[in-house]
Amino acid sequence: MEIIWIVMIMIGIIMFYVAEIGAYFWHRFGAHTEIIDKVSLNTLKVKQTHDIHHTIIDDEAHADFFYVCFLLFFYLVFLYLLFYYDYLSFSWLLVLYLPVFITLVWNWYVHSAYHQEDHWLSKYEWFKHDKFLHMNHHIDPNCNYGIATHFTDEILDTMSYS
């Protein structure tokens, strides 16, 4: 019985990384290319709304968060169907969903804070550093796709400190 909890914790941690990597690819290829717009027959306009965010510095990209909510909803429906048809226990549903939900909501919250002048997080050095990296992304949209973390930028060589 104890081993299952250890496995669940490990899977939960892995799901955090899966969500961060997914957010990186969504941002890099979903928001900065027209891939999703073309697949959706131009109904979603992800690149268009993200371009607006890049041109108006105090825009907190709430339109982008709509897409995150959309993805989280359909991921939850998928997991719920697995649960409903007894392919997944409720505990596993939580282990697979909560880390992704928390990671993506945290990314959105931190991202919104980057675009607010006197946010309460501004007193922390880590936040100032990450805000600097994010604002570099607005200057050069070909780097620093990470939002709350930048380990994927480091791994995929898209990190820029200048």
Positions of the model-derived regions?
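Feature marks short, highly hydrophobic, charge-poor N-terminal signal-anchor/signal peptide-like helices
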Residues: 1-9
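N-terminal cleavable signal peptides for secretion/export
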Residues: 11-14
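Membrane-embedded catalytic scaffold of the fatty acid hydroxylase/desaturase
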Residues: 16-162
